[in-house]
Regions:
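A mid-sequence interfacial segment
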Residues: 89-129
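Amphipathic alpha-helical interface elements
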Residues: 1-65, 83-90, 94-105, 133-153
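Short, glycine/alanine-rich amphipathic alpha-helical segment
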Residues: 52-80, 113-132
Length: 153
């Protein structure tokens, strides 16, 4: 099937998907842990309550829930997770809310918004930096993750 729009090519489209998937994976790491940590969490901090929520909303709920967590290591994890999700949501949203343009003869996305004022191309280098940042944040979240020995599934 021939697309009815200009395409940046499979490699660039793969990078878009890679970033979206990496963010979703980090999000699920945190959401997937809520059940096993439930004895230490406020009753409203559940997968069911957060199903369908934006990544930004999940980030806020995790940080708010940290203040009510009864175990310090769980609170630390929720803060680390909430902070990480807030940051990766911005990266993913930069791509998903960008617009196509032609840069140096190639189709690329261009992020342009007025509040806060910013404009930049979503280049291969931008993807490299964004994916490296998501990976670093995922490692930080995993380092703060309460053990399965202490909190079995």
């Amino acid at each position: 099937v021939t697309p009815h729009f200009a395409s940046p090519g499979d490699d660039y489209l793969r990078r878009i998907g890679e970033l979206a998937y990496a963010v979703s994976s980090l999000e699920w790491t945190l959401l997937g842990d809520l059940h096993r940590l439930s004895a230490t969490l406020p009753a409203t901090l559940t997968v069911s309550e957060l199903a369908g929520a934006t990544t930004g909303r999940i980030a806020r709920q995790l940080r708010q829930g940290a203040a009510l967590a009864t175990a310090p290591e769980v609170a630390t994890y929720l803060i680390a997770g909430g902070d990480a999700l807030a940051e990766v949501a911005e990266l993913r949203n930069a791509v998903l809310h960008a617009r196509p343009t032609t840069i140096d003869g190639e189709q690329r996305l261009y992020r342009w918004r007025s509040q806060p004022a910013e404009a930049y191309a979503i280049s291969d280098d931008w993807f490299d930096d964004a994916l490296a940042r998501v990976a670093k944040l995922a490692r930080q979240v995993n380092a703060a993750r309460p053990s399965f020995d202490a909190y079995p599934a």
